[in-house]
Amino acid sequence: MSTAPPLATAWLVGGFGDACPFPTGSARCRVAAVSGPVHSCQRNRQQTASHQGRVQQGFRAMQVIGLCRFSYPAVGGFQVEHDSIEERIAYLYAEERMEERFHLMETVALPCLREQTDPDFTLVTLVGDSLPDRYRNRLEALVADMPQVQIVAAAPGRHRDVMKQVLNDARRNPDAPCLQFRHDDDDAVSVDFVERLRQTVRDCSGLIANHQTVAIDFCQGYVARLGDNGIHAALGHHPYFVAALGMYVAPGCRQTIMNFAHHRLARFMPTITLPDAPMFVRTLNGHNDSRQKGAKEPDLQRLDAAGLAEFDARFAIRR
């Protein structure tokens, strides 16, 4: 597994210069130590004054919106097929499955968001209006200490239509630009993910000012399996995974990150690819919807002490 450089050389992407602002040896300092620089895009494109002005004005206060689907019974959107919405609801709310989803939310999906170096973001957590009260109450208790989380309940509906509506409803000002990302309930992102999203927009302002949508892909990360015998993981280059994939949306644009299949974003808009540091963990578990068709198991290796320290510092995954 990768080893972080000496802590004395630590620095964090996001405008702090060469000095790490966090205590030496702290979790955030260790993340800073393994972060690499963001490569700036060229800024020599001609830009329209009105659009560029609106984009620049929105950089500092740009809203960042994440979408987490927590066992929402959508019509479509699953690779596991069901003959009726009732069958889908029964599958999603089965006790064994729900226990696994809560465990992954508690240990993987939420800790990394609690420790974001930039805590200014919104996480819309979409649930079904049929979610049993015991699960709704448990979810509310789980995120009670996270003011960023908004739990939204919706009736079953066409997957993409519901997701697009939820994201657009979450925009505080549709006439201002925003950044969007998806966050599955079994994945983690680096604790500087939101910080780096905003930094990338600033670095690539010339490109972004000329487009309605631009994808931002942090394409290096881990595939991992977490169990009683430790964490087994493989670091790799995975372009356009759901995890750590963001999208800029221009002022007034109603398109969302859910308008597009994540692996096809590059067909519809410019994309900024940042492969410099591990930015996500995608877990393998008993109910990975995207792995239901016999996907080949990657070559996972058990993390040693250095690997466990990186998962702790970078992703807030602790075992």
Identify the residue ranges that each predicted region occupies:
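Short, low-complexity intrinsically disordered segments enriched in A/P/G/S/L with frequent Arg
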Residues: 4, 16-22, 32, 37, ...
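N-proximal low-complexity "stem/linker" segments adjacent to membrane-targeting elements
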Residues: 57-107
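Short, acidic, metal-binding catalytic loop of nucleotide-sugar glycosyltransferases
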Residues: 110-120
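Short beta-strand/loop segment that forms part of the nucleotide-sugar
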Residues: 121-130
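Active-site-proximal specificity loops/subdomain of glycosyltransferases
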Residues: 136, 145-178
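Conserved catalytic core of nucleotide-sugar-dependent glycosyltransferases
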Residues: 158-172, 190-264
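Short beta-strand-to-loop acidic/aromatic patch adjacent to the donor-nucleotide binding site
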Residues: 176-188
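C-terminal catalytic/acceptor-binding lobe
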Residues: 238-319
